[in-house]
């Protein structure tokens, strides 16, 4: 089985396991599917030939590829996450393989009229000639991050079968609940034992990221008073309208759909409820720490104003920081970025260095003493029915993992 075949076989099998995390759950991991998937990976890591394969009570999977050199090489790690996003259903994923893609629109689901078009997704024609894997238009795909996870598995398998490629000790970890910001919450950096690591959790070819958002989540509960609408004057307080009012105070142009690059945003992730009670969940993002704090204060001030207007119980805010910009922790060990950059260049991949408009486990791990930049995996349009991945780019990601391992040994 060549690299491409192994990537397709593993990836299409992995995405069929429902591993969506759950923001409302207080277990670790938050969903049983992640445990099921972790157990499968433990067996497969052992089959490949990795040692020290473990899965702890919190669902964290770790394994070792022993060094095959006498040189004193720093221990490096590669990480991916077990869970998939909560934004769209990840149950009953039916991956569709399109070999030698022609670059034109793909009808994902004729019955539901779901079509992946170059008009909506201009990058699509650039994958002409590739093997791409899409959804069937009814679920997300889960390439975030089962593409990265698959690439790590395939790279480790390749290194074991090609001992002529010299490398130091490599640690592998698969973490739960990344999509809800809890990935590293129970990650044992000491047990992992790497000097630094890379998350395989990026997007298109060449992506190399070591700046991330500062991130917070805000849960708002709006409490209303429900009465018969016919006699509601001066009595009714509509909780859903309170939620609408809160949202109206946020700057319209500072939302994900209007921002790019280094611009931050407020994002209403979910809103549900009725007259009696409504709940809204926002995420707050900014690269600049000072601006990040300003955004949080803005939310608090709006809540305070509404409480003064409608009563203390009308709006209840729960806000917590999720992770911080990892740049501060990467800069002192800049060589780990340089090695990844050089690895890509040697494979004729043009590195595309840009800030992560999102988070990876690396954001938090960097602050826990494990500096962790992020590398591309080949996926596009994450978290929805138009998600797809290029197997050709996945193959390149595998080559980058192998080349990084080789270069650390060579430069030791």
From Swiss-Prot:
Binds 2 Zn(2+) ions per subunit. The keyword NADP does not apply. Keywords: Aminopeptidase, Cytoplasm, Hydrolase, Metal-binding, Metalloprotease, Protease, Zinc. Zn(2+) 1 binds at residues 81, 144, 201. Coiled coil: none annotated. Cleaves the N-terminal amino acid of tripeptides. It is an enzyme of class 3 (hydrolase). InterPro entries: ArgE/DapE_CS (IPR001261), Bact_exopeptidase_dim_dom (IPR036264), Peptidase_M20 (IPR002933), Peptidase_M20_dimer (IPR011650), Peptidase_M20B (IPR010161). The active site is at 83, 178 (proton acceptor). This is Peptidase T. Belongs to the peptidase M20B family. GO terms for biological process: peptide catabolic process; proteolysis. One of its GO terms (cellular component) is cytosol. Zn(2+) 2 binds at residues 144, 179, 383.
